[in-house]
């Protein structure tokens, strides 16, 4: 498991129901571009606005459509819900799950470790830990290390953490466990992660510019660092959309609309789309 993995948006219709036709189009588009994997029920996919049943249906539909490495987000504030969703992911044939640390309530490190260990013990499926301290309880390097060394099915981590120190600390775990995977969740950290010894990225902008992420990946794998750096600079520019929009999800969907994708600019409440002024600024960046 490596390379460019896309955390899919969840397309919605005007009535806020899931647009499965648009979802299928997006998956096929990304596969044609050559991405290495698909990740459904992600932060980008507004998983917190979906019901448990919708998350299961979405996971099933994605598995039906894609032939690539397939990951399902099974995070929740409830450990038992995580176990339920993770069991479901295994039943439908997912290649692995991505589990964000519990959010809303602040937890101590031992509680976070217990949360993940309970899932790892209950469900034998590859698990990728998801560290995103801006939205959920932080996962310390020591907790990641302990989980990686104690549970063979904890195979890696996705780090949406704006810190090279944290990223390099994760990669040091590979010295003790060679097959441990380290993915960045930040587009601007994609190349730095590869240079440090990481395995790829699970990045939101790959929904609408996967060709640039693949340029970085392919150039790096061929040893053409100059070309990889040039493409990585494009990604840094594109991530400016996040500082323009009022929310992460709004930025990504507006960028997709700006590039002419058959995706409606609709978010599930309480999220709201930004207006025309923000759209014009994002269009200038991504066009």
Swiss-Prot record:
Cellular component annotations (GO), alphabetically ordered: cytoplasm
This enzyme's EC code(s): 4.-.-.-
Subcellular location(s) of the protein: Cytoplasm
Active site positions: 43 (charge relay system), 104 (charge relay system), 130 (proton donor), 158 (schiff-base intermediate with substrate)
Keywords associated with the record: Cytoplasm, Lyase, Schiff base
Top-level class of the enzyme under EC nomenclature: lyase
UniProt GO MF annotations: 2-dehydro-3-deoxy-phosphogluconate aldolase activity; 4-hydroxy-tetrahydrodipicolinate synthase activity
Keyword Cytoplasm: yes
InterPro entries: Aldolase_TIM, DapA-like, Schiff_base-form_aldolases_AS
A single BP term in Gene Ontology: small molecule metabolic process
Quaternary context: Homotetramer.
Protein name: Uncharacterized DapA-like lyase PH0847
Organism encoding this protein: Pyrococcus horikoshii (strain ATCC 700860 / DSM 12428 / JCM 9974 / NBRC 100139 / OT-3)
